[in-house]
Amino acid sequence: MARGRKLTMSQSERYLGSSYSYGDSNGNSATDESELTEEDIWSHAVDHSPEMLESHGAWNTRDAVVRNGRVGGGLSLAFEDASSSPRIVHQIRGGGEGGGGGGGGGRVERQLASSAPVNVPDWSKIYRVNSVESIHESDEEEEEDSGMMMPPHEYLAKSQQRRSRKSGGGGSVFEGVGRTLKGRELRRVRDAIWSQTGFYG
């Protein structure tokens, strides 16, 4: 700070506005009308019933407002739709304060998270493909050394060899390539190798 200057506004006034001060409830009426208070925002959503207050008399922020059998609070009250279907509300037995079962205050309504039933299609029947279990069984039958790990390019090469043995094809990398491996022919061989090993350039 510069030596010759006085700080004319406190930090709270600088950040929160000039009409704000701690503990000053007798502020200027013109500025008080333009300022929002907590009651302006939360008065319609707050239900000051005795059930909503804790035993200490303080507001319990975890409890929500119960309206029309639904539990909600905050923005959910602003977007409340009367035409929406009712939700399942589970009743939970709470440990009553003061011991005995008198007064009927042991039941507390709270809405638990639940999802709507979802129809999950069976894609194996739709696309008529083998199930995952049958694919794994066929892999186990064909693979001689099931305990060893192998790199992906070797795995693909072995699976290609198995396919070519079953189909009766030759062991050549690319069928029909001429003698010379110059220029275009070399590119075709390279692309064929990449397509069969799974590494595309």
Curated annotation (Swiss-Prot):
Gene induction: Slightly induced by dark, abscisic acid (ABA) and salicylic acid (SA).
Keyword Repressor included in the entry's annotation: no
UniProt region (Disordered), positions on chain: 1-39, 134-178
Compartments (UniProt record): Cytoplasm
Keywords, alphabetical: Cytoplasm
InterPro entries: Senescence_reg_S40
Keyword NAD: no
A GO term from the CC aspect: cytoplasm
Extent of Low complexity compositional bias: 17-29
GO biological process entries: leaf senescence; response to abscisic acid; response to absence of light; response to salicylic acid
Family according to the record: Belongs to the senescence regulator S40 family.
Protein's recorded name: Protein S40-5
Organism of derivation: Arabidopsis thaliana (Mouse-ear cress)
